[in-house]
Amino acid sequence: MSNKVYTKKGDDGTTSLLSGRRVSKTIQEIKSVGSLDELNSFVGLLRSEILDVNGIFETIQWNLFNAGSMIINDNNTELTEVTQDDINSLEEAMDLMNKELPELKNFILPKGSRSVSTSHICRTIARRTEIEVLECKVLDNFIKLHPISMYLNRLSDYFFVLARYIAYKEEVKETIWKN
């Protein structure tokens, strides 16, 4: 791989799928990959703010890259995929954190320290990206992309629990939404 980042091939509004086939940057798959990249960048920011004790953030980042490659895999190249095991790992991590957290009885406002707020940003980007991936199903990709949308759904939940957990450990009081 060269250090040269620019190729000028995308100047016409197209990009390459895994096969090399050129497609418009405006198709849903490419929008989804862009959102996965955005989420991955914010996970990287979160990693810079709190200790990645068991390596879960790095695993999440790899899974987000894997999800992006699954989306643009138009020639069935064998790839590392997001699996049910990845979803189970998120659920196990949430269960461990939830054991220490007080019961949630109301909606809470997304606020707190920088790491709490960054976790909430990751949560909302994951939720939006899940919806964008689901929109790809109209392009006959639903079976292939279903594990990705499930993973993103769980990932959004994970970042919500993580935000609460960080706030709890930092002794930041949650602000209950008053309706």
List each model region and its residues.
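Phosphate/pyrophosphate-binding loop motifs in nucleotide- or prenyl diphosphate-using proteins
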Residues: 1-179
